[in-house]
Amino acid sequence: MKYIRTLSLLILSVLAGAVAPAVAADKETSRVLCLDGRDNNVRTGIGLMAAPWTLELWVQSDAARRGRREMLIAGGEYSSLSWVDNEALALVDGRLTATAARLTAPDTLDGAWHHVALVCDGRSVALHMDGRLLARRDTAYTILPGTIGVGEEDGTFTGSIDEVRIWTAAVSPRTLKRWAGRSLSPSHPDYAHLYAYYPLDDFDGETAVNWVGRGFRPFHLRNCRNKWRESAPLAYARPSDNARMRPYDDRQRLFNAVVQRSEWDCDRGSSDCQILKLRLAVQGSRRPMRLTGLTLSLDSTADLSDVAAVHVYATGQKALSGRRTPLFGGSHKPARRLQLATGGSDGLTLEPGINYVLVTFDIAPGATVGHRLWADVLSYELDGHTYRPEPPAATVAQEVTTRNALDGDYLKVLQWNIWHGGVHLADSGRHRVISLLREAKADVVLMQEAYGIQQMAARATGYRMKSKSDGDNLALFTSLPMEDSIPWREPFKSNPAIVTMRCGHRVVVNSLWLRYAYRPEYTCYYPEVGGNPARWVHEDSLLALPDIRNLIENDVEPYLRPGMSAVVGGDFNACSHLDWTARAARFHHGYGPVAFPASLYMQQAGYHDSFRTVHPDETLRPEGTWAVIYGQTPYGRIDFVHSKGALRPVQSKIIRMMPEIDAPWPGDHAATLSVFRVAEK
């Protein structure tokens, strides 16, 4: 039983489907992405891609309404790097253009559907349309395909897009032509190099799944606006009218099976903590397949007694469907190996598109804080035949964590910059933010860029709240008794209060925001070559450093009485010397060590960086907080939770995925969730 057997099944399915011509799918189920040229902002989040690569998609330009310069695949925000092409494929005056290669189609696009591709093999770049080579030039370069249909802030495409395929290989002209009008399958000769695949039939106004996406950054589409204060129409989907693209709708076949893990820790005594999802991507509706078995390994769970029960559910075709249908008989006693089968029942009938299967744990009330929780999908069965999923991406292990009502000497603190009030994910971003707050179950939430969500979040969670106004930058939420006797001096930068833990320990807490370096804005553009870290340090010494010194010396230290502790956290808009070391320079484009002054000040003032205290090796845990949604900057940690006094950090995690596995992230910053314990005297 090997992974290759899945591929064998799929190839046989393709051959079987070749006996009779495929019938075009119902146009109501085959959909395309529509952009209106105004303020659509559809992001993939994909980062830097060195040659070889291929960009491939179907386009239908609105010739009557299009602008002079429109992007098809580009970099999006913060993508302007001198050595990178962030406008890979565009329309300039209606003509297909690869700017960096100086390639332009001879004719303007009409209003018909066209298959277009840009291919770089490491030596040359070629522009193709409808199976014809339009132009070629001897050159090679790195691209940043972070958006579909929009540039850094403008250049929105006017028209429709379908079947976006991004490859880490140079797809041959023959293969491009042969597969242009066909749905992809694992029999494609470059299938192993498929980096992103958006059929777009599942686009729901908020997101569309990257069928090959894996890990904490699966590059699912995120639908939003650039002008966040405005309300221009979002990109949307409509039934396809592309007669040249014939989706597969014959005997059902499996495209792939991907395991997506959660990184969220599980509270002691909690039920149905999400551990993983098996994402089954299926094509075709004739003779649908059934999931009839699942084999799980719990070998990497530290102690099986921490797990009270294991559950498996079918959760529908959307990550956020809300559906949970028990599979394989409901609850199961944990074991190192769990072989689950339908036991004569029909099993889960798979639907065309994405199908999710969720594995959850009930955590024992007496589970040990810090113990590892883990499950592997060893195999799954379709109609009684056994296959293995694709190897999962590396993720941070889940652990048992505290439960507020049970552990009075623990303090759980969530810090998060939610990005402009949480409005950057379609029209549902604020609801996604609140769902994360509920799931985190933090005692204290230190929020930045709250901008209007304050009252909505307080009502939804039941938290006490302190904010200068409902439209202000900073907000502080807590489930604990709170004294707001500390006055505001600079409410845009500092929001202090005092909370009393369940054990009686009093803590000064502060949600803060510091000014950022902008000459240059190194936290966003550190992938640039030829950077000068001394200049970054100088800028921070003029902005972030005086801000943090002012806030600590005036809004925290004067209110620390004997026996009290302090927890301060927020968006420092500056990196840490603890991360940017010589050993970790490979994560930061060769830069390091860098003596960032704000983090050095906190260390010298006696404050402990909770994440780096718990994870002292910066090469083993290099995660960043800015930005989760931009693949070119994965290791910029600029958000921190620091402590001082009797509180000691015992757990800390960068939260970079939603509690609901495989759902889109609503912000740009990751969150930081740290657990502290009052030290014994």
Model features per residue range: what roles?
Residues 22-38, 177-240:
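Extracytoplasmic low-complexity segments
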Residues 26-37, 56-65, 82-141, 224-238:
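Extracellular glycan-interaction surfaces
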Residues 28, 134-160, 185-195:
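Flexible glycan-contacting loops in extracellular carbohydrate-active proteins
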Residues 34, 55-56, 66-82, 177-183, ...:
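Aromatic-rich beta-strand patches that line glycan-recognition/binding surfaces
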Residues 34-53, 101-107, 152, 180-189:
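Short surface loop/edge beta-strand patches of beta-sandwich-type extracellular domains
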Residues 54-63, 155-181, 196-204:
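Extracellular, beta-strand-rich glycan-interacting domains
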Residues 239-405:
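Exposed, polar/acidic Ser/Thr-rich sequence context and nearby capping/turn residues
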Residues 401-435, 439, 476-681:
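Active-site regions of metal-assisted phosphoester/phosphodiester hydrolases
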